[in-house]
């Protein structure tokens, strides 16, 4: 049985991201796997290649030119065999992992020229959900402290439109729960920390490091605006951010998709800080400005605008939520955060946005009818409880959402399909059953071509 955020059994809509790190096998991000319409790096799983035979790999045993041609194919094949990937980094304490990655990046990066040591941190994210959390915020604070104390040639600054004009170096990082095989599946046992430094003046990746932290020492509670966000979908801007860290190596060009959205990212960072501090009018202005910036049409911008309007008690919140739904349908995947009573198919009333659930359902139903969409409604749960119980509960909750949508728009009858997958498609997978893995307890709506 699942529990919700704040000890409730919650079914929530959400989404996630794919990660692969230097020194680790590449992995497929759930968003990429289930979202063919959204471009993302092609995933692959690396396997260790068999070691070459000594006769083919050492000068002493290499065949002479006059040797029989029968040995040449084997020799050529051995020479073409790629080396086995290095072992994963050891698991260590949270602070030690952050220090290890930070020291490696700043030590290995080419020294900055005089008066050119500015480095900005593009806020780190969870490598699956794309959310910022207490853990990622703590990492940023630790990086800032370490650089100030030990790398005086650098000056860490906040990411802002003004600072970006100076073409500084930029830090990008992901913090991802993984299992014993370093994969984002099954029981998560540690957090994998990827940290990359890019040089905006050259457009190149100049340093990278990977470390692992013990899962028990990590606080993955989402930051305020992410904790409150009602909707998740596969977002190209966040996928580009994650790929910049996970799918890169030193010397690579920084991905253009990431660079195109940097101005919007700076505005979103400032807006998130304002929201966290309760400055909702300023947050609304910044999110609205970000929406008009290049590559500014992002889920976190739409979420931020909606939440700021809710906090300001403005009537425009209904239109803002409709924009969220439209964005999700255009991405072909919409996850909405509904909190249910423990073991029940009825909504809980403790969530501060629960009073808006009726409006959410009305807008989702209206958009589906307007777009003449058929919908697949899929319930999800965290891994807590038996598989059979989770499968049944996730289906019942999907069917409840289905019935509510059809009540609001009778035209949706015979155009929706309900399904439950239990915990088989977890995004976070930590099993904490709190706000940090709320995305695993989601109800997901996806437009489908053929009606049931």
PLM region spans:
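A short, hydrophobic beta-strand-centered structural micro-motif
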Residues: 104-105, 118-124, 149, 154-198, ...
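Periplasmic peptidoglycan-binding/anchoring modules of Gram-negative envelope and division proteins
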Residues: 94-113, 345-378, 406-407, 445-452
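Short, solvent-exposed beta-strand/turn patches at coil↔beta or beta↔helix junctions
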Residues: 82-96, 329-363, 382-388
């Amino acid at each position: 049985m699942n529990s919700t955020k704040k000890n409730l059994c919650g079914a929530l809509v959400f989404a996630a991201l794919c990660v692969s790190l230097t020194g680790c096998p590449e992995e497929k991000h759930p968003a990429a796997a289930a979202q063919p319409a959204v471009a993302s790096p092609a995933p692959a799983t690396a396997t260790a290649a068999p070691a070459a035979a000594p006769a083919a790999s050492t000068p002493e045993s290499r065949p002479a030119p006059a040797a029989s041609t029968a040995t040449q194919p084997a020799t050529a094949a051995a020479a073409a065999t790629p080396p086995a990937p290095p072992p994963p980094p050891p698991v260590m304490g949270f602070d030690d992992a952050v220090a290890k990655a930070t020291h490696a990046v700043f030590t290995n990066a080419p020294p900055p020229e005089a008066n050119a040591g500015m480095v900005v941190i593009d806020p780190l994210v969870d490598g699956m959900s794309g959310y910022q959390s207490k853990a990622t915020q703590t990492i940023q604070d630790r990086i800032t402290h370490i650089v100030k104390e030990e790398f005086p040639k650098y000056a860490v600054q906040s990411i802002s439109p003004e600072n970006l004009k100076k073409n500084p170096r930029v830090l990008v990082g992901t913090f991802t729960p993984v299992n014993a095989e370093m994969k984002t599946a099954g029981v998560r046992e540690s957090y994998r920390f990827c940290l990359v430094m890019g040089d905006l003046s050259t457009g190149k990746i100049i340093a990278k490091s990977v470390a692992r932290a013990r899962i028990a020492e990590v606080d993955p509670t989402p930051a305020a605006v992410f904790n409150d966000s009602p909707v998740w979908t596969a977002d190209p801007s966040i996928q580009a951010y994650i790929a910049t860290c996970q799918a890169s190596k030193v010397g690579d060009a920084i991905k253009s998709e990431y660079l195109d959205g940097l101005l919007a990212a700076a505005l979103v960072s400032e807006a998130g800080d304002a929201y966290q501090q309760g400055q909702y009018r300023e947050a609304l202005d910044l999110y609205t400005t970000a929406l008009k910036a290049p590559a500014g049409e992002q889920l976190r911008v739409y979420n931020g605008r909606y939440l700021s309007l809710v906090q300001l008690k403005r009537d425009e919140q209904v239109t803002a939520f409709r924009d969220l739904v439209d964005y999700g349908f255009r991405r072909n995947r919409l996850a909405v955060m509904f909190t249910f009573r423990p073991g029940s198919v009825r909504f809980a009333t403790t969530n501060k946005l629960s009073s808006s659930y009726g409006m959410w359902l009305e807008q989702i139903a209206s958009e589906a009818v307007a777009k003449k969409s058929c919908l697949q409604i899929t319930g999800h749960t965290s891994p807590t409880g038996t598989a059979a119980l989770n499968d049944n509960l996730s289906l019942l909750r999907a069917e409840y959402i289905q019935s509510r949508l059809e009540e609001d728009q009778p035209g949706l009858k015979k155009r929706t399909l309900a399904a439950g997958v239990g915990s088989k498609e977890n995004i976070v997978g930590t099993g904490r059953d709190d706000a940090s893995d709320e995305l695993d307890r989601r109800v997901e709506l996806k437009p489908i071509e053929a009606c049931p």
